[in-house]
């Protein structure tokens, strides 16, 4: 006796032979190549189902992890006109998804017998000549390899293509890169066919229903408004040819009058109810209220069937309060990234060996690649990531204690990181010119070898040089940078109507004002140029606003360098009296009659001198001079 655990109802017939779904079953009807081609070429939804995932999988391509000269040689081979690997892989993936399979033929210079296996170890520099993409219908497959000890198990024993003069040529499976569309899991059902199904096979009904719904809704548009005319004795007119001619002439004339005078001419009394007589005219309109939701449902089903989010498939904005679509796109890109690892990388393994040997003449074991991220970061997110990497490296280098890693090794790793992610354009060329951190000559401590002028003596640019602290005793700290192009800045201020301004020598930007005592030596150093200067480029967001309770009027501006430097000192123990840090230059403490809302902010570049470390002067305001 067989017992089935299922829900049944003898009253409604659910789960019994009376169930309306009892006779339903699945059947498989393969789509032919002609219909698949017609769908891809003639239906926008089917075309997107085929093209979107290959386009996203190959859009950012991959990053080789090797020395820069090696990377340049490898990429030169990949981008050669007859190879163009990224484009060829994209095309092969589309063909495989459309027809169920495709191959990329690997053309090697000097090959005589294509039926012989391709040994990547025999490839020399420049031996890779070209790559050709062929669909499953352009090649004939030999018997499927059934030997489980063979590396080509489950693949054709050979591929046959048309050669010169149409003569068939057999190609060993090691000489092609094989792509399969939707894999057939039960190989017994396909016999000797080594290919998969088209991805359109499983989504056919969903795509067709979405297209049909769109077409039917479009067909309703001409019927949105229909004129209905009631005519007494209409049947009598249609009995004879003369009557039908009179009927046609009657309504032709009525329609002409409607077009000329925007009026409907009818024969009748115009009365209502019992008094009604003669012809009657009315309009019927079709309601489209629920049709957009219905069409959207069909399109959403098609998107789900294709495993592509609607925001990507339909190029539409996400719906819902505070919806951004980021989660949908992240899931989509995660899917593409997973496919890169499970579909592309294994398929390209042998070809990659050929590319490396053709580019370098050998196969260094340390070289590998990583798929480039598909999710792009905004400029703000990139800056935040850059800061986190820099802060992490500073922590590993021992900002507050001993280093956790060898500093030179950490520097080399950081240079490679910033080069690969493009955070610092031109870094690689600069390293080649100036050398790495390990290449720099060791310098003795400035505190031990630099003679300091006595207190009160003037240093460069006539500025009093402060005595350096020769110990690491914690003390309050004030760090600033002088504005070098102060005269240009003050010229702008005078043009804007400021009668009194700070002197050029007093113009500066504050980086740190720590009332808490800190170890000055733990503050690190700035990332400016060799001369210690920092230039904030012209333009960008700038405002002239009052600041604080002292009547100061300042120019607010943005500088990632200053912000990161400030945060680095905060993390090293410096205090700050305000909720956040905003770089600014004080213009004046006496605004006078100037209407700040009418002031045009200074747009030129700001050039600041080296950082100045000094103790906090609580009487700093008494030393300010305005002119």
Curated annotation (Swiss-Prot):
Disulfide bonds: none
Source superkingdom: Bacteria
Catalytic-site annotation from UniProt: 508, 510, 584, 586
Region annotation Disordered: where it falls in the sequence: 437-474
Binding-site list for 3',3'-cGAMP: 105, 614, 620
One Pfam family linked to the record: Phage_portal_3
Protein keywords: Hydrolase
Keyword Hydrolase found: yes
Binding site for 3',3'-cUAMP: 105, 614, 620
Catalyzed reactions per annotation: 3',3'-cUAMP + H2O = U[3'-5']pAp[3'] + H(+); 3',3',3'-c-tri-AMP + H2O = A[3'-5']pA[3'-5']pAp[3'] + H(+); 3',3',3'-cAAG + H2O = G[3'-5']pA[3'-5']pAp[3'] + H(+); 3',3',3'-cAAG + H2O = A[3'-5']pG[3'-5']pAp[3'] + H(+)
GO molecular function: hydrolase activity
Family in the record: Belongs to the anti-CBASS protein Acb1 family.
Further details from the record: This homolog of an antiviral immune evasion nuclease may be due to cryptic prophages, or it may play a role in regulating the endogenous antiviral defense system based on cyclic nucleotides.
Protein role: Counteracts or regulates the endogenous CBASS antiviral defense system. Phosphodiesterase that enables metal-independent hydrolysis of the host cyclic di- and trinucleotide CBASS signals such as 3'3'-cGAMP, 3'3'cUA, and 3'3'3'-cAAA.
Protein name: Anti-CBASS protein Acb1
Taxonomic path: Bacteria, Pseudomonadati, Pseudomonadota, Alphaproteobacteria, Caulobacterales
């Amino acid at each position: 006796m067989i017992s089935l655990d299922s829900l049944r109802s003898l009253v409604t017939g659910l789960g019994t032979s009376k169930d309306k779904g009892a006779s339903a079953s699945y059947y498989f009807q393969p789509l032919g190549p002609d219909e698949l081609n017609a769908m891809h070429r003639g239906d926008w939804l089917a075309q997107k189902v085929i093209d979107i995932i290959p386009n996203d999988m190959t859009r950012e391509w991959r990053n080789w992890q090797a020395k820069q000269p090696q990377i340049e040689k490898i990429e030169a081979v990949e981008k050669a006109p007859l190879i163009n690997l990224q484009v060829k892989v994209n095309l092969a993936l589309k063909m495989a998804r459309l027809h169920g399979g495709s191959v990329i033929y690997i053309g090697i210079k000097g090959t005589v017998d294509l039926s012989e296996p391709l040994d990547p170890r025999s490839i020399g520099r420049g031996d890779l000549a070209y790559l050709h993409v062929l669909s499953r219908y352009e090649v004939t497959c030999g018997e499927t390899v059934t030997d489980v000890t063979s590396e080509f198990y489950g693949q054709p024993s050979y591929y046959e293509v048309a050669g010169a003069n149409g003569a068939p040529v057999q190609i060993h499976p090691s000489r092609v890169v094989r792509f399969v569309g939707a894999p057939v899991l039960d190989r017994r059902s396909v016999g000797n066919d080594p290919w998969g199904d088209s991805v359109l096979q499983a989504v056919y009904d969903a795509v067709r229903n979405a297209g049909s719904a769109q077409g039917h809704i479009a067909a309703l548009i001409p019927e949105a408004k229909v004129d209905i005319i009631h005519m007494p004795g209409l049947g009598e007119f249609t009995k004879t040819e003369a009557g039908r001619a009179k009927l046609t002439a009657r309504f032709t004339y009525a329609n002409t009058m409607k077009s000329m005078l925007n009026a409907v001419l009818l024969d009748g009394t115009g009365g209502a109810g019992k008094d009604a007589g003669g012809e009657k005219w009315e309009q019927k309109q079709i309601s489209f209220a629920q049709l957009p939701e219905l069409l959207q449902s069909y399109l959403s089903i098609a998107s789900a069937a294709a495993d592509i989010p609607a925001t990507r498939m339909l190029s539409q904005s996400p719906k819902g309060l505070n919806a951004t679509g980021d989660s949908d796109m992240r899931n989509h890109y995660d899917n593409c990234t997973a496919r890169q690892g499970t579909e592309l990388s294994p398929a390209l393994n042998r070809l990659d060996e050929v590319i490396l040997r053709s580019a370098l003449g050998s196969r260094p074991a340390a070289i590998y690649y990583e798929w480039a991220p598909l999710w792009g970061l905004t400029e703000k997110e990139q800056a935040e990531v850059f800061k986190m990497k820099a802060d992490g490296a500073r922590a590993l280098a021992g900002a507050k204690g001993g280093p956790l890693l060898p500093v030179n090794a950490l520097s080399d790793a950081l240079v490679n990181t910033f080069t690969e992610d493009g955070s610092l354009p031109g870094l690689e060329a600069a390293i080649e010119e100036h050398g790495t951190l390990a290449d720099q000559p060791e310098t003795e401590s400035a505190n031990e070898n630099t003679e300091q002028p006595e207190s009160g003596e003037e240093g460069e640019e006539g500025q009093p040089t402060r005595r350096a602290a020769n110990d690491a005793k914690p003390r309050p700290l004030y760090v600033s940078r002088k504005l070098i192009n102060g005269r240009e800045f003050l010229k702008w201020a005078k043009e804007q109507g400021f009668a009194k301004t700070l002197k050029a020598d007093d113009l500066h930007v504050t980086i740190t004002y720590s009332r808490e005592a800190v170890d000055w030596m733990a503050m690190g150093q700035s990332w400016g140029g060799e001369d210690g200067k920092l230039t904030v480029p012209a333009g960008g967001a700038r405002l002239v606003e009052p600041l604080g309770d002292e009547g100061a009027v300042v120019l607010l501006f943005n500088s990632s360098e200053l912000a990161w430097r400030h945060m680095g000192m905060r993390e090293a123990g410096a205090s700050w009296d305000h909720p956040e840090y905003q770089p600014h230059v004080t213009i004046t403490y006496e605004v006078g009659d100037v209407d700040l809302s009418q002031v045009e902010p200074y747009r030129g570049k700001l050039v600041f001198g080296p950082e100045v470390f000094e103790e906090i002067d609580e009487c700093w305001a008494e030393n300010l001079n305005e002119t």
